[in-house]
Amino acid sequence: MNELKIVFMGSPEFALTPLKMLLAEGYDICGVYTQPDRPAGRGRELCPPPVKTLALEHGLAVYQPQSLKKPEEQAFLKELKPDVIVVAAYGLILPQAVLDIPVYGVLNIHPSLLPRYRGATPVAATLLGGDEWAGVSLMKLEAGLDTGPVYSRSMVAIRPEDTTPILADKLAFIGGCMLLELLSQIPSLPEPKVQDNTQASYFGMVTKEMGLINWQTSAVEIERRVRAFFPWPGVFTTFNQKTLKILEAKPRNLGLGLKPSEVRVYEQSRVMVGSASGELEIIRLQLEGKAGCSAADFVRGQRNFDGVNLGV
């Protein structure tokens, strides 16, 4: 058992890998903070965050405060006497009183190359931006939104098939490795480097409305949204007054002369849709009330698809 006492704060799948890596290294996780259970699914039953499930499987103490701004919550956290707090997509703001508790500060795994893409959804922002590289920044948390000084950064090339969950998994592993390397240097931590705020950009929460396709944008932009907003909120349009989700797509430049939103069944089984620039080839899609399927299967079941305009 490593004698360093760690409080871990995280909620979604992204936080699972760093927590697993800390456990595998034998660190003393004296408490796990995660968001409260939320209603989910059609039945709106309360569902625990993924981190809570993992923590309980390992017999760890789990805490789910609505906020850490209350003095009593801060006093309780202080009683845990953490040497360091590790944050990975926790989702709650940490006030200065909390940041001051651990001996070696609060370390945050942020999945972007800070100061680029500060905010709540940096992985989706990276894909939307069309960047060639994604990355992780291991930073010392301060009161500002992802403004703290950075201990280290690591980069990974973005592949054409990367969606938000695929890329997030890669970055979570990289971030976990970076975290273990930094923790091994305690008590002699290096001096983190201040961010260049003039280069900062922000991206907030993703909303359902962001998934609605604007066919007046380019095929390249729409395809980026398909990958960035998978699996939620998804990217969608309408067909025959029903929601049509685009699950997988590729931008093309075939010179078909299609107007934005106009569908062309190409080579009998391929589906092309016009945009402001280029065609969007739909690879997989899902009509409201149906299972997802390939474009070829969809065309076989929708004989009137060729020539329609989507979203009208």
Swiss-Prot record:
Which cysteines are disulphide-bonded? none
Pfam families associated with the record: Formyl_trans_C (PF02911), Formyl_trans_N (PF00551)
The top EC class is transferase
Listed under catalytic activity are: L-methionyl-tRNA(fMet) + (6R)-10-formyltetrahydrofolate = N-formyl-L-methionyl-tRNA(fMet) + (6S)-5,6,7,8-tetrahydrofolate + H(+)
List the GO cellular component terms: cytosol
Give the record's keywords alphabetically: Protein biosynthesis, Transferase
Q: EC number(s) of the enzyme? A: 2.1.2.9
Q: Which Gene3D superfamilies match?
A: 3.40.50.12230
What terms describe the molecular function in GO for this protein? methionyl-tRNA formyltransferase activity
> Where is (6S)-5,6,7,8-tetrahydrofolate bound in this sequence?
112-115
What protein family is recorded? Belongs to the Fmt family.
Q: What does this protein do?
A: Attaches a formyl group to the free amino group of methionyl-tRNA(fMet). The formyl group appears to play a dual role in the initiator identity of N-formylmethionyl-tRNA by promoting its recognition by IF2 and preventing the misappropriation of this tRNA by the elongation apparatus.
- Name of this chain's protein: Methionyl-tRNA formyltransferase
By which gene is this protein encoded?
fmt
